Amino acid sequence: MITLGFMSLSRQHEADYSAELAKRAPEFGIRFIRFTPFDISPDTLRVKASVYHSASSTWNETEMAIPDYIYDRCFYGKDSHSQKAKPIVEWLKKYPKTEFIGRGLPDKWTVLHDLQQHSVINPYIPETIKVSRYEQIHSFLSKEKACILKPAFGAGGRGVILLKLGKKNITATYHIGKDKQTKTFSNQTSFKTWCKKVLQHQYLLQPYLNIQDKEQYPCDIRLFMEKNEAGEWNTVGKAVRRGYKHGLLANLSGGSDALTFDSWFEDIPKKQQVVLLDDVFSITQSVPYYLDERYGPLFELGLDICLAKDGRIWILDINSKPGRKSILRVSPEQKEQLYTCPLKRCQYLFSEQSQKGVLPRES
């Protein structure tokens, strides 16, 4: 029996999701375990893990060899825990006796910069600058009048700041949970001091895209894509995420509603419907394959796009470890597809290796 290891920074992270996979794993001839990078012993090359027993629906502790296949669901922050985990995961990616069912993407700047080199994808990427100096922000804001600062390593909308240049002041608006906060700077000196403090962390700078609908709710579209057994990318689901009224973003962690794509789509003008469908097709037929070629093999992607007030379609973000909540909320019928695809991927990789004469190791 082959072993698939669900790796996260905490055994409790995505517990419900891993349990759904674990329940279905025996159907695919897979033993399913959970572990963290810190559970690996560098001396023995063995891992302490929780293994799922379907007969009793329980997790039991065990020690075994590093699993044959790894499903990487590690989400990194700025904390020391994350920083300690990263080199272990990088070592695992090079370990010859295991295989990741999908690789991750590098930082946002690297991904966006590479996508800008692709002739089909380039028109969908907002102008993006890797910012390290106040002068860059001042120049960009003077030109655009409104721009967005995004953390280079952020997720879920955390740390995003809207800058607006007024006649007499500059404002910086951001979310703290559900609440929107605004700082006002009456002169360049105070704004410069604030910028230098913010830029102690890595940020990207983009023009502000107004993505509010007619009721003033920010909306974006999550395209959830997975690679099938044949290596082809499929759009498993589409959901429209709606943030707080008058908010900046639609993907605030824990704070967005999910609408069906069809109900939202019917509400936009007919001319925009045609353009949107054409652009979605172009994006889904180019972005996954290009990223796969650059950084792969990948397995799943969350493509976040928007229809801005100016009528243009933009790519807002790309995530190689996407969540499933918004898709499941609007398309519960996709549950089995979402919960079996990682197992099918693992089974496919094993089948490929078996044809080459590579057999799973004893644990």
From Swiss-Prot:
Q: How does it sit in the membrane?
A: Peripheral membrane protein
Please state the protein's primary subcellular location. membrane
Question: Pfam families from the xrefs?
Answer: ATPgrasp_YheCD
How is this protein named in the record?
Endospore coat-associated protein YheC
Asked if the record carries the keyword Membrane, the reply is yes
Q: Where in the cell is it found?
A: Forespore outer membrane; Spore coat
Q: Name one GO biological process term.
A: sporulation resulting in formation of a cellular spore
Gene responsible for this protein: yheC
Q: Which InterPro entries match?
A: ATP_grasp_subdomain_1, YheC/D
Q: Which UniProt keywords apply?
A: Membrane, Sporulation
Key word NAD present in the record? no
What organism does this protein naturally occur in? Bacillus subtilis (strain 168)
Output the Gene Ontology cellular-component terms: membrane
Would you identify the family this protein belongs to, as annotated?
Belongs to the YheC/YheD family.
Mention one GO molecular function: ATP binding
Q: What does this protein do?
A: Involved in sporulation.
